[in-house]
């Protein structure tokens, strides 16, 4: 992952089609076009896992069914705890077969429609529910040496709580960090960088002009009419965090993608 930072390789978020879509063929074409654009430009395609708790096709499943090419260090699959054990292994086996080595392991957004891994499924004792910590530990045990796994860091949670969770995540096998989205320099992220100087850190940049949507991530209301320029903010993030990678969430492929070749110099 440090290779991505040193070579200024953006992580670009791609959402797979929702299973409830009424235009599956069109959505699959959109997914393919975005994936190929990212791959051919040498960046890393980061494919979400039931984002916002909405049931979607799985990233590795889409890649395999569509016959898309995989470059091992240019794909990262998000993986959360809202799966059956059988489905979890299907995903991991598919990633292994395709040569996908990067996983972002998160607890995830749940809903009543989604199954949830149980402690017994992952051999976890003395816990009431499975979090990213138990999932990391399980994958490391069942697939030793196969995957390089990252975890989320939320600078909007109480710092003591978040740093304790991060400590447990690294003990379970995490090797890199991706933050929640920021739009300005963040003191908690600065503290995290001081605590983990040798760990690759990827800063998530919010690329949607709908700044009000970010309220759900940061935990406080951001008025929709707040002035916000995603590209200018991205450039500032690079200035504030020159030794970190950047994950582009909700990137506009038509209007913004052509611009990012000039934002990381």
Give, region by region, the residue ranges found by the protein language model.
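Active-site-adjacent beta->alpha loops and helix N-cap segments on the catalytic face
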Residues: 53-66, 83-90, 109-139, 159-161, ...
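Active-site mouth loops of central-metabolism enzymes
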Residues: 8-29, 74-86, 148-161, 217-228
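Catalytic-face loop-and-helix region of soluble metabolic enzyme cores
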Residues: 198-245
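Catalytic domains of carbohydrate-active enzymes, especially glycoside hydrolases
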Residues: 30-48, 169-178
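Hydrophobic faces of well-ordered beta-strands that scaffold small-molecule active sites
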Residues: 8-16, 43-47, 75-79, 103-105, ...
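Acidic (Asp/Glu)-rich catalytic clusters
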Residues: 2-6, 32-40, 60-72, 92-100, ...
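Conserved anion-binding
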Residues: 102-163, 167, 172, 197-213
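C-terminal extensions of enzymes
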Residues: 8-10, 235-265
């Amino acid at each position: 992952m440090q290779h991505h930072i040193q070579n200024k390789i953006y992580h670009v978020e791609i959402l797979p089609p929702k299973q409830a879509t009424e235009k599956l063929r069109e959505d699959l074409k959109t997914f393919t076009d975005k994936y190929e654009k990212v791959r051919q430009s040498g960046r890393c395609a980061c494919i979400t896992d039931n984002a916002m708790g909405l049931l979607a096709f799985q990233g590795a499943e889409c890649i395999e069914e569509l016959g898309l090419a995989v470059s091992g260090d240019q794909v990262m699959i998000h993986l959360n705890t809202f799966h059956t054990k059988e489905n979890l292994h299907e995903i991991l086996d598919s990633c292994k077969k395709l040569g996908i080595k990067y996983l972002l392991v998160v607890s995830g957004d749940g809903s009543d429609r989604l199954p949830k891994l149980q402690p017994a499924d992952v051999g976890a004792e003395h816990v009431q529910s499975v979090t990213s910590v138990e999932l990391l530990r399980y994958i490391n045990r069942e697939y030793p040496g196969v995957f390089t796994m990252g975890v989320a860091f939320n600078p909007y949670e109480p710092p003591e709580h978040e740093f304790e969770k991060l400590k447990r995540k690294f003990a379970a096998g995490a090797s890199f960090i991706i933050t929640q989205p920021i739009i300005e320099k963040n003191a908690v992220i600065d503290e995290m960088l001081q605590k983990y100087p040798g760990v690759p850190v990827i800063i998530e940049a919010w690329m949607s002009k709908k700044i009000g949507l970010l309220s759900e991530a940061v935990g406080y209301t951001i008025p929709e009419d707040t002035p916000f320029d995603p590209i200018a903010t991205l450039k500032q993030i690079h200035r504030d965090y020159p030794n970190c990678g950047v994950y582009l969430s909700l990137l506009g492929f038509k209007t913004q993608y052509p611009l990012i070749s000039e934002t990381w110099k």
